[in-house]
Swiss-Prot record:
Segments forming domain LRRCT: 416-505
GO cellular component: extracellular region
Record NCBIfam families: internalin_A (NF033189), List_Bact_rpt (TIGR02543), LPXTG_anchor (TIGR01167)
Organism: Listeria monocytogenes serotype 1/2a (strain 10403S)
Protein name: Internalin A
Membrane topology value: Peptidoglycan-anchor
UniProt cross-references to PANTHER family, sorted A to Z: LEUCINE-RICH REPEAT AND IQ DOMAIN-CONTAINING PROTEIN 1-RELATED (PTHR46652), LEUCINE-RICH REPEAT-CONTAINING PROTEIN 9 (PTHR46652:SF3)
Length: 800
């Protein structure tokens, strides 16, 4: 019994092993894990199911084909594996490479690294540039010293918390938001987590930090930084920080960079009164009030925000460097009190009045390019300026800059402005207003459209319309020691409005369009039975207008809607058989040959199978749709003649109709057989099923002759005995007489003509009587037979 139980248990074990594809794995609840092994030689492509990995392993294992089998011993020989850039999607099978110490699977398409979970001999892993999200399988690889996983999809790095031997950890460009696992990795020498980190609590114990750079994450909560009180410099650029309240306690900070975050409220900064260098560029700041008390500030960067009001800066008189570029500034009057400024950026704003800088006499560098400044007279007193960048404005007169003799760097290039539009005419003339530092007019360098210059005017002779004319200027200028080219373009718009008229079958709409512009295409007109082709410059023919490329000329234009006529199908259906014609809208159909149908007369073509309207091929026109016309017929009526021995009656019956059966005709000595299509023989007409053909017919009454009684001998008729045993005296039956032969059951009428026969109205049930020339002969023969019979009977009796 025990032996049988052992065999049974052994069978179950074998079944489990087979079900597990020949692999026995013992995980021991996550401790003392053993790498997987294969128990029998197995084809490579069954172990490594990814085709690309199988090909790589074929080479590593020295095989010729991925279907070749390998043993666990073969797999144990592999210690390093370089498999980068092979398009590998799965590393299934790696769990059998028990002796791996180094692997490189970078630049593949991996998502699942589960097969690594028990490869505890690994010391270095490179799997950057994949699609890995779950790194749980790395949790027990405590021998790892190097781990590179940048450019993946990792969100949870908790499995790394026990990898205390790590000295290199690269996790940038992932989606990590929790770095708590890093708090115990005290041996780390190289760390990057430029990902989506929001929680900085794991940094709480790093109290010796004096400079911290957490750039390029998604940090929004920086409360843990309040514990890093030794911080003197904090660089937290390119994150998602919106609340900087925790920084209020970091009073030792003298440098703070929060460039590239989501800051709107900077109220906390009011307490950081030791700040000397503050970078708040590239945020969403509009209210600068909290900065009003940071009087130690010497350098303030506020570029690329949403600032339109800089009045809170008016009291920061210690400022030497101020950056206000790329904001929404129009009014810069508050800076007029910042008399210690030596460096000021105002470029890429909407400033047209630069006069508030006139009191900043310590300014050495001033940048206000890409604004709308046209008058620079307020700069005349800034004699300490050595760098002036004023390009891309609307400056036309350099005279106020003549006394800025300390300038060494100068930018006045690419001035550009557009004059107010003037109406187009053949001769256009405008004054030149561009002056150099001496006040002399700068002659145009180029003049568009063949224009000419006679100081002080530029003139154009324009035989045809152009939407604008322009001229350029370019002249080297020297101010102080700064030399540059004062250049720019002056554009003079020429306004020209013309009418575009759109015609649709006599209806007109008009749009005003400036010459040189694209026309807005009207809604496509609709015309029954037609397809819109486009807008053309003629009612027929002409050139089609292209609304994507054709521009309004310098004259009124007329555009006509042109259509192509649609074709439709007319289907003619005749008892399920169809033919068709293709006919243009409103065209006449060609009438088909009238169809024929046995027993019917063709009525015409109708728009319904029954009823409907008849199509008139002379006047009815093709509608804007496909149609079906149906052949309709009326049944013909034919005559059926009933012939009874030359006497006839008739019926009129529709084709395929049933005839009304006449009363059966009678004929003396005959029994009526029926109506036949021949006088003799032929086919009997069945009034219940036979239907009227497509022609007149004649049906003939056919009869069968009744049997005749034998004649009597000597003119006497022996008595007959009826069934009751009584005798009946014989009666003479004279042919042609008005008598009855009761023994035969036949009756004869004295009437020998059928002129009055009406088979439908007769009230008699008997056949009509007729004359019969053979009756006398039959009677005599009958009498002779009776006489002979009686004689023989008598003789027989005598012989007895």
């Amino acid at each position: 019994m025990r032996k049988k139980r052992y065999v049974w248990l052994k069978s179950i074990l074998v079944a489990i092993l087979v079900f597990g594809s020949g692999v026995w794995i013992n995980t021991s609840n996550g401790t003392n894990a053993q790498a997987a092994t294969i128990t029998q030689d197995t084809p490579i492509n069954q172990i490594f199911t990814d085709a690309a990995l199988a090909e790589k392993m074929k080479t590593v294992l020295g095989k010729t084909n991925v279907t070749d089998t390998v043993s666990q011993t073969d797999l144990d020989q592999v210690t390093t594996l370089q498999a980068d850039r092979l398009g590998i999607k799965s590393i299934d099978g790696l769990e059998y490479l028990n002796n791996l110490t180094q692997i490189n699977f970078s630049n593949n398409q991996l998502t699942d690294i589960t097969p690594l979970k028990d490869l505890t001999k690994l010391v270095d892993i490179l799997m950057n540039n994949n699609q890995i999200a779950d790194i749980t399988p790395l949790a027990n690889l405590t021998n790892l010293t190097g781990l590179t996983l940048f450019n993946n999809q990792i969100t949870d790095i908790d499995p790394l918390k026990n990898l205390t031997n790590l000295n290199r950890l690269e996790l940038s460009s992932n989606t990590i938001s929790d770095i708590s696992a890093l708090s115990g990795l005290t041996n780390l020498q190289q760390l990057s987590f430029g990902n989506q980190v929001t929680d900085l609590k794991p940094l709480a114990n790093l109290t010796t930090l004096e400079r911290l750079d957490i750039s390029s994450n998604k940090v929004s909560d920086i409360s843990v930084l309040a514990k890093l009180t030794n911080l003197e410099s904090l660089i937290a650029t390119n994150n998602q920080i919106s609340d900087i309240t925790p920084l209020g306690i970091l009073t030792n900070l003298d440098e703070l960079s929060l460039n590239g975050n989501q800051l709107k409220d900077i109220g906390t900064l009011a307490s950081l009164t030791n700040l000397t260098d503050l970078d708040l560029a590239n945020n969403q700041i509009s209210n600068l009030a909290p900065l009003s008390g940071l009087t130690k500030l010497t350098e303030l960067k506020l570029g690329a925000n949403q600032i339109s009001n800089i009045s809170p800066l008016a009291g920061l008189t210690a400022l030497t460097n101020l950056e206000l570029n790329e904001n929404q500034l129009e009014d810069i009057s508050p800076i007029s009190n910042l008399k210690n400024l030596t460096y000021l950026t105002l470029y890429f704003n909407n400033i047209s009045d630069i006069s508030p800088v006139s009191s900043l006499t310590k300014l050495q560098r001033l940048f206000f390019y890409n604004n709308k400044v046209s008058d620079v007279s307020s700069l005349a007193n800034l004699t300490n300026i050595n760098w002036l960048s004023a390009g891309h404005n609307q400056i036309s007169d350099l005279t106020p800059l003549a006394n800025l003799t300390r300038i060494t760097q100068l930018g006045l290039n690419d001035q550009a402005w557009t004059n107010a539009p003037v109406n187009y005419k053949a001769n256009v003339s405008i004054p030149n207003t561009v002056k150099n530092v001496t006040g002399a007019l700068i002659a145009p360098a180029t003049i568009s459209d063949g224009g000419s210059y006679a100081e002080p005017d530029i003139t154009w002779n324009l035989p045809s319309y152009t939407n604008e004319v322009s001229y350029t200027f370019s002249q080297p200028v020297t101010i102080g020691k700064g030399t540059t080219t004062f250049s720019g373009t002056v554009t003079q718009p020429l306004k020209a409005i013309f009418n575009a008229k759109f015609h649709v079958d006599g209806k007109e709409t008009t749009k005003e369009v400036e010459a040189g512009n694209l026309l807005t295409e009207p809604a496509k007109p609709v015309k029954e039975g037609h397809t819109f082709v486009g807008w053309f410059d003629a009612q027929t023919g002409g050139t089609k207008w292209n609304f994507s490329t054709d521009k309004m000329p310098t004259n009124d234009i007329n555009l006509y809607a042109q259509f192509s006529i649609n074709s439709y199908t007319a289907t003619f259906e005749n008892d399920g058989v169809t033919t068709s014609q293709t006919v243009d809208y409103q065209g006449l159909l060609q009438e088909p040959t009238p169809p024929t149908k046995e027993g019917y007369t063709f009525k015409g073509w109708y728009d319904a199978k029954t009823g409907g309207d008849k199509w008139d091929f002379a006047t009815s026109k093709m509608p804007a749709k496909n149609i079906t016309l149906y052949a309709q017929y009326s049944a013909n009526s034919y005559t059926a003649t009933f012939d009874v021995d030359g006497k006839s009656t008739t019926q009129a019956v529709d084709y395929q109709g049933l005839l009304k059966e006449p009363k059966a005709p009678t004929k003396a000595g005959y029994t009526f057989k029926g109506w036949y299509d021949e006088k003799t023989d032929g086919k009997k007409w069945d009034f219940a099923t036979d239907k009227m053909p497509a022609n007149d017919i004649t049906l003939y009454a056919q009869f069968t002759k009744n049997p005749v009684a034998p004649p009597t001998t000597g003119g006497n008729t022996p008595p007959t005995t009826n069934n009751g045993g009584n005798t009946t005296p014989p009666s003479a039956n004279i042919p042609g007489s008005d008598t009855s032969n009761t023994s035969t059951g036949n009756s004869a009428s004295t009437t020998s003509t059928m002129n009055a026969y009406d088979p439908y109205n007769s009230k008699e049930a008997s056949l009509p009587t007729t004359g019969d020339s053979d009756n006398a002969l039959y009677l005599l023969l009958g009498l002779l037979a009776v006489g002979t019979a009686m004689a023989l009977t008598k003789k027989a009796r005598a012989s007895k």
